[in-house]
């Protein structure tokens, strides 16, 4: 496999997600039950995100998605012995609009005597105690506590920097109503500011390494072109940015992604404007779109 590594990387750049997954062009709703279940079973056993490539309509058609969600629910309930715990672990609506967990021994973990799943969606963690954690009026003993508080995806790191554009406008003020960009690479009013896999690009919905490389190469080519033409500044227009944001919103609206309260929408950050930030669809086509605008 390593001997063919360069060709693998080249092929990855021509795929939907930048990963050498086997994407099925057939629709789940047009596939006989037995064949559809066999496809899900094969991908479940394989593990990983390729499960969502089982059929072409899983993330655009609720009926198709329900066939996948029901399959996963049955798998989880067959593994997790406690019914209440299994219910907490199963997707309650659309599957795949949040990061997918395809089993690699994860669900079996909840059958261990020293593992408990505590639902705090309706309550909260009340206190850290000398012995562990108190939640929902009960104390849970722990030797160590790992803080998994989530992250401010796609915009958080940029907005922690005091980036200023024309007239001293701060990027955090420009994006007060949600991030807007052109191609996920630049922001109107901020000349010579380049983002890599920023909001408005396929970004986290693809293989990030492939997408990062594509953006870095585009920025490199842009800088070379500026130098060759004797130019010192490049900036997206407001109209181009508006058109691109409209396109991203149109594509996202054709999918099931915006139906979940996920970090793709910024739903995990209190007070953050709900905007679907990545561009769903074909990362290869997005790369081609960038090249067409050079």
Go through each PLM region and give its residues:
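N-terminal FAD-binding dinucleotide-binding subdomain shared by FAD-dependent oxidases/monooxygenases
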Residues: 1-294
């Amino acid at each position: 496999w390593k001997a063919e590594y360069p060709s693998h990387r080249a092929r990855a750049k021509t795929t939907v997600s930048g990963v050498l997954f086997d994407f099925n062009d057939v629709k789940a709703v047009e596939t006989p039950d037995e064949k559809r279940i066999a496809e899900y079973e094969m991908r479940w056993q394989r593990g990983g995100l390729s499960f969502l490539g089982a059929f072409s309509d899983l993330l655009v058609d609720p009926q198709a998605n329900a066939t996948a969600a029901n399959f996963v629910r049955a798998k989880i309930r067959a593994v997790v012995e406690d019914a209440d715990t299994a219910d907490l672990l199963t997707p309650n609506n659309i599957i795949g609009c949040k990061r997918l967990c395809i089993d690699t021994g994860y669900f079996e973990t909840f059958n261990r005597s020293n593992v408990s799943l505590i639902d705090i969606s309706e309550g909260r963690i009340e206190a850290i105690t000398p012995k562990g954690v108190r939640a929902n009026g009960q104390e849970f003993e722990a030797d160590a506590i790992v803080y998994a508080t989530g992250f401010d995806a796609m915009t958080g790191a940029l907005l922690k920097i005091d980036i200023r554009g024309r007239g001293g406008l701060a990027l955090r003020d420009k994006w007060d109503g949600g991030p807007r960009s052109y191609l996920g690479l630049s922001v109107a009013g901020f000349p010579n500011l380049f983002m890599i896999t920023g909001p408005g690009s396929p970004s986290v919905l693809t293989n990030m390494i492939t997408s990062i490389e594509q953006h870095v190469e585009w920025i490199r080519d842009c800088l070379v072109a500026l130098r060759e033409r004797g130019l010192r500044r490049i900036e997206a227009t407001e109209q181009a940015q508006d058109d691109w944001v409209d396109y991203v919103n149109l594509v996202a609206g054709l999918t099931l992604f915006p139906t979940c309260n996920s970090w793709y929408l910024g739903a995990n950050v209190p007070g953050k404007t709900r905007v679907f930030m990545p561009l769903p669809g074909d990362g290869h086509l997005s790369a081609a779109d960038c090249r067409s605008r050079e």
